[in-house]
Amino acid sequence: MSTPRSDPAPVPPREPTRTSRGGVLPTLDDPVVAGASELVGGPAGRRLLVESRWWTPLRVCLLFAALTTLVFGFGAKEHCRSSGWVPNNMYFHACYSDVPPLYSGRGLNQGLFPYVHSDAVLAAHGVYSQVEYPVLTGMLMWVEAKLVPGDSKDPFTTYFDINLLFATAFLLGMVALTALTARRRPWDAALVALAPAVGLAMTINWDMLAVVLLAGAMYAWARDRPALTGVLLGLGTAAKLYPALMLLPLLLLGWRTRRLGPVGAVAGWGALTWFNCNIAFVLVNFEGWKEFYSLSQSRPAGFSSIWYVLQINGHGFTPLNTWASGLTVVLFLAIAVLALKAPRRPRLASLTFLVVAAFLLTNKVYSPQYLLWLVPLAALARPRWRDFWIWQAGELVHFFGIWLYLGQYADPKRGLGDTGYTWTVLAHVAGTLWLAGIIVRDILRPECDPVRADGLDDDPAGGVFDGAPDAGPAAVAEDRPAVPVAG
């Protein structure tokens, strides 16, 4: 049996872009940041000594995140906060949020505990739907509702503000975890902190909980803690199903490096954690617990999915579940082939981004807050401002487009029609495909990968895969015995 060889070094390595402490300086690493730095005196010198004990990269990124929340998370929603959560306000001022309507729509304002009541009990309280999210999200909704003072003059806005505080805490955690996961590249977390689409989308729903849990799982894996990774993935999956998708990249890289033991530990701890989060609700009221899963199975093509756009343009697909699931599986298989056949072992963040992006592009619905799922993964997978902002631009076009499209039902004269809306969805799809395509290019040509290009890093978020021997195509080719040539 041949012995696996280490990953080939990228060629040619460029001059390291580091400070005295080993951190990458963005003005020496990213062309966009270098160009922008000319406004304040140009890029940092090669001998710059960064010794500030207070304004560390992490603290600066956290300040950026706080400003993003203030301007976009709070400021952009101020019209709805002051004028009411009604369709004309929410759609035409782009301040829509699910949070205030569901406060009463799911009985949270009456103190009803999610999932445990029968439909008859809910109906007696004027509530006609179970909470349609996984249990950890439902628990967050309930906790936030319990924090609303009983004498609040505007409990709906108070509930929104409480959710904003939770979302802000999750954003700060997401930024910190991204910076720590990136190791020598803490400034990459500024991509997360300064993304306007994050500020705009963070209060639409409760997705930030799952996003920060997946960011925590990435950090735990980077620190070689598979049990903690599994627990955080289990919690994330109990809040939103998508964090479980990280298991596919882990499995592929575990197979390629022959290090499947830690991957099995992640899967085991994740399954146990998810089970413990759910079992009580299953036993108390199975019908209430399964609402999320039943809705996911039965729902038709939802707003902003490729299936909805095809449908409104006269190209419906039936049965939709088969088409959507089939296309998802095809893309996952393509990613698996890429992971196993690439000339050098791909990085974990790169594969995780591709898997989540594939799921989002083929899913039956694409809500505007789903962009949050990709943001920390994008910062780790492709830490380049140009590509990140091309993707963000597409998401911003879609963000405003979906509200104008929904606004036509409140005021047809001001709303956006099918054609205009189709173009905004295509902007989101094109932006996501652009970033995914660049990441695929980096996998096929590792010398183009910003993280690996200076020859100092392999896979900072890779945990046991970082610097591991590679049993991929390059190693196989080197181990193959030479074919004798007849003389």
Q: What residue spans do the PLM features occupy?
A:
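Multi-pass membrane glycosyltransferase architecture that uses lipid-linked
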Residues: 2-289, 325-487
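Periplasmic/ER-lumenal interhelical loops and adjacent helix-loop junctions
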Residues: 280-326, 333-336
